């Protein structure tokens, strides 16, 4: 009888251990970079960053640069990262978007004032069910799991608007117009292989001779 009880206890222990291991989060690693810094997503869902940090892009609560990878604060179970703007962005496994950093100033760098709050990841509660984000300077796009695309200004991230006329989108990409830091354009790929573009059309960025609509 004692052996039977011990056997049951051991079997139960093994099952519980298996369940714990099965629930351990795992995601596909990725890296995103711009001219100043890099974000790396590990398979365990943590985010690591290195490079210039004067705008808080590393997400460590300070403006201290880092020669070596440091872990971004407060993020777990992340599935996507984006480092294209001075604002860094990430998407977690629940589909929420996180952002941190400060917009690049047109004034001299020595006048930049960065708070710990700006340099620490914050969640955007106005949108969820997101699977991918992209940014180019001030503006950002979020692709939801239902194939719709949403836009927001990084200065007011809780004011999220749906991009009309798009559905069944599988990939999004934003670009900055060469020679004008305030002009942007966006592209989207739908499930049928069609490419959609909008925004500024300087130098025919949208692949058409027609004027675009500024973001």
Locations of regions flagged by a protein language model:
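Sec-dependent signal peptide recognition
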Residues: 3-8
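Sec-dependent signal peptide cleavage junction
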Residues: 15-27
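Beta-strand-rich domains and repeat architectures in extracellular enzymes and scaffolds
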Residues: 27-41
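Short loop/turn segments that connect beta-strands within the blades of beta-propeller domains
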Residues: 34-35, 43, 52-54, 84-86, ...
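Conserved core positions of repeat-based scaffolds
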Residues: 37-40, 49, 87-90, 99, ...
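Short glycine/serine- and acidic-residue-enriched loop/turn motifs that recur at repeat junctions
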Residues: 41, 48-68, 98-124, 150-164, ...
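Short glycine-/Asp-/Thr-/Trp-enriched loop segments that recur within the blades
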Residues: 81, 178-181
């Amino acid at each position: 009888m004692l052996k039977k009880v011990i056997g049951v206890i051991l079997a139960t222990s093994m099952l519980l251990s298996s369940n714990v291991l099965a629930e351990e989060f795992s995601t596909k690693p990725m890296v995103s970079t711009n001219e100043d810094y890099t974000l790396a997503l590990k398979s365990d869902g943590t985010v690591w960053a290195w490079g210039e940090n004067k705008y808080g892009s590393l997400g460590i609560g300070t403006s201290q640069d880092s020669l070596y990878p440091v872990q971004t604060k407060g993020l777990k179970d992340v599935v996507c990262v984006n480092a294209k703007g001075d604002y860094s962005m990430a998407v977690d496994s629940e589909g929420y978007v996180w952002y941190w950093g400060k917009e690049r100033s047109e004034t001299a760098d020595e006048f930049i004032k960065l708070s710990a709050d700006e340099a620490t990841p914050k969640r955007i509660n106005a949108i969820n069910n997101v699977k991918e984000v992209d940014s180019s300077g001030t503006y950002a796009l979020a692709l939801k799991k239902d194939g719709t695309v949403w836009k927001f200004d990084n200065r007011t991230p809780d004011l999220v608007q749906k991009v009309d006329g798009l559905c069944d989108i599988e990939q999004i990409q934003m670009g900055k117009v060469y020679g004008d830091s305030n002009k942007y354009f966006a592209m989207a790929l739908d499930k049928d292989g069609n490419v959609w573009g909008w925004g500024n059309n300087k130098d025919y960025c949208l692949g058409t001779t027609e004027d675009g609509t500024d973001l």
